[in-house]
Amino acid sequence: MLLGRIMLPLLLVLAACLPDHSSGRKEGAHMVSDKPVRVGLVLSHFGLGDQSFNDMQYNGLIEAYRRFDIHTVFRVPRSEADTDMRPVFDELIHREQCNVLIAGEGFQMGPLVYELAKKYPDVYFIVFEYKAGVLPNVINAEFAQNEGSYVAGFLAARFSVTKKIAFMGGVDIAVIKDFEAGFRQGMQRGEPSCQLVTEFVSRLPDYSGFYDPKKGYEMASRLYKEGADIIYAVAGGTGNGVIQAAREAGKYVIGVDSNQDHMAPGQVLTSMMKRLDVAVLRLIEMRIAGTLRGGVYRFDYKNGGVSLTEMEYTKKMFSEPLLRELRTLEKQMADGVITVINTLKG
């Protein structure tokens, strides 16, 4: 296994603040029963510096370390193969003695998490957006990406000049389709005449669509040439290529997961943030308090689990009436006034 390779200067600084306390209990460490809380995070093999899913979770871990002074450690497997992921989890359980494990990539780590949870009932496993039954020590963290996408779709439809907007999904899995459904519904509210073109970078069982910025760039360049003036890129690291294409074409993109507005100031209209950092911090805090139980925890507009950015570089591009509408829409979303399609609801 590999320690996370940090690709951004900021993350280099943050990593220096996250020592590996493998020698045992720290003075003043927070306790659960008679054991100190020890948290291990397994990121996807793409590692740190993705400006997306991995970085958000890592930031939450950093904040938990700073606030609670607990043992924290992260690892990055060489690949998504079971033969590479399993030893990482084993190391965190046995050598690091972690009693809270966060699986940073639910759709690929989920099956292994459920297997290990049955074997180690005293370890709490947090997995994002993957559910295969109910276990007392498995925490399923879900996000209302449909709600955030609805608001993003409304904004895109009101801002688009060509009235042709594209949705680029990394892989055709259920959670990505939930993004698309909310985005489409929001577009319809914003401007019913808008056309939405939906494409996926890869299809199951191929997950490379989340880690292929070159293909994202090529697809986005084509979509812009075909008349789309905004692309909602829900594709992990592949979205970095979409942002590059927007920059070169003079078009617009909506980022996802983390705040990507700075990656092309003035052309990333906003980012629909799934606050994995908030989720990681809150769930660790609950474990420290002894209130964490197995089950589903949903992070939505109401509790700060999803939101648009402050649009630092683009707010001046929107009219004041549109910004007022957007603020009203966000309040309605938080208050539960708006019902958004949820394609994941069983």
Regions found by a protein language model. Name each.
Residues 2, 22-23:
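Intrinsically disordered, low-complexity regions enriched in serine, threonine, proline
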Residues 2-9:
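Sec-dependent signal peptide recognition
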Residues 9-10, 282:
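Intrinsically disordered and other compositionally biased segments
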Residues 18, 25-346:
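A residue-level marker of the well-folded mature domains of exported/periplasmic proteins
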